Design a protein with these regions (language model features):
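Carboxylate/His-rich catalytic cores and anion/metal-binding grooves
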Residues: 1
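Intrinsic-disorder/low-complexity accessory segments
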Residues: 11-14, 20-21, 26-28, 32, ...
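Detector for the c-type heme attachment site
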Residues: 50
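Scaffold signal of the M16-like zinc-metallopeptidase fold and its non-catalytic homologs
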Residues: 4-10
């Protein structure tokens, strides 16, 4: 019972770790979770886990040198204040614990850090796993009940802290969003533009992800060329920096190449437009004009495909650049359709163009 068979209980039906899906939001569980999170806007969110059996009990703050620089200092100050309540609760039980080691707060795409970049205090708890009913570890015999007790105790200490720090937590969330707007004026980058002339599906899915994170996306009012890429209205959109989610916008779009520490517990880079292979550019200096920002896009519509065919087609061709090209090829092969690869560019004259 101490060694669970792979893929273990950590994963969902698709064998994906949902605690790494807070930014990606590719799974229905995560999509539902973020809908509730943004509707509720909690002041504190606790993230309870288990870790290696030879350890004791961890609660945040994490390793200070690995804090994400986009997370306000006040977030870590409040986390440390709340930690005092956990320490008192575990001292009363005689449980061993530690902080500021092992885990960090750099990657904002997990359950204890996504809240931090959204005006909430996220707190990670890690209990040394018993992996059964009873296990011997360097600290003696540990039972399943003991492990559960520590998690319950720190859940209750969180509630006690929230009650005592109610005003501080409410003020923090208010200030988090107001300072996001004021700080935007001092940033050199005033916004981002992204687009995909040849793939409406990729543009749709990326925009859908931004909407899930409550990031404001606007129409591009006129064609611009930035960094060697041309962006055209209808096929490119703008994300202005001056908005409540300014810090999350920076976290998703910026390319960070300098760090205060050389070690990371988790992901060290996650520039999201690159994951979608989307051309995008910073709007700063002379590239930025307020009149580039058009109406806000409240929702995107999934683009519909269309088969262009003559009366007696000899063959069909489609571009591999499209987001759904691999799926289309799979469906064709699954239906016993014979498919070929073009090994060189070609131009073909058809009845439809």
């Amino acid at each position: 019972e101490h060694t669970e068979a792979w893929p273990q209980g950590r994963f969902n039906h698709y064998w994906f770790d949902l605690n790494r899906d807070w930014l990606l939001v590719q799974h229905p569980e995560s999509q539902g979770r973020l809908e509730v999170f943004h509707a509720w806007k909690p002041n504190v969110l606790t993230d309870h886990h288990e870790m290696q059996s030879h350890r004791t009990f961890f609660f945040q703050p994490g390793i200070p040198s690995r804090n994400n620089p986009l997370t306000p200092a006040r977030t870590f100050e409040l986390t440390a204040q709340i930690a005092e309540y956990h320490a008192a609760a575990l001292d009363q039980l005689g449980s061993l614990y530690y902080t500021k080691e092992s885990y960090d707060d750099f990657y904002v795409g997990k359950g204890s850090t996504y809240p931090d970049i959204n005006g909430t205090i996220g707190i990670l708890f890690e209990q040394a796993s018993v992996r059964g009913h009873l296990q011997q570890n360097p600290h003696g015999e540990r039972t399943f009940a003991f492990a559960v007790r520590n998690q319950v105790a720190t859940s209750l200490s969180t509630l006690a802290a929230v009650r005592q720090l109610r005003v501080e937590l409410l003020t923090h969330q208010r200030d988090f969003y107001t300072t996001a707007l004021t700080e935007a004026g001092d940033l050199p980058v005033k916004g981002y533009v992204f687009g995909a002339d040849d793939d409406a599906a990729r543009l749709h899915h990326f925009s859908q992800l931004l909407h899930t994170h409550r990031i404001q996306v606007h129409e591009l009012t006129r064609s611009i060329e930035v960094g060697g890429d041309t962006f055209t209205p209808g096929k490119a959109w703008v994300v202005p920096m001056r908005q409540p989610q300014q810090r999350l916008v920076r976290a998703l779009f910026e390319r960070r190449t300098s760090f205060t520490d050389s070690v990371f517990y988790d992901v060290s880079t996650w520039t999201m437009p690159l994951a979608f292979d989307l051309p995008y550019a910073e709007l700063k200096g002379r590239a930025w004009r307020q009149d580039l920002v058009g109406d806000q896009i409240k929702a995107t519509v999934f683009p519909q495909g269309e088969l262009e065919a003559s009366a007696h087609p000899y063959a069909y061709a489609f571009s591999w650049k499209d987001y759904y090209a691999p799926r289309a090829l799979y469906r064709l092969l699954d239906g016993d359709t014979r498919a070929y690869v073009a090994t060189a560019p070609f131009v073909a004259q058809t009845e439809v163009g």
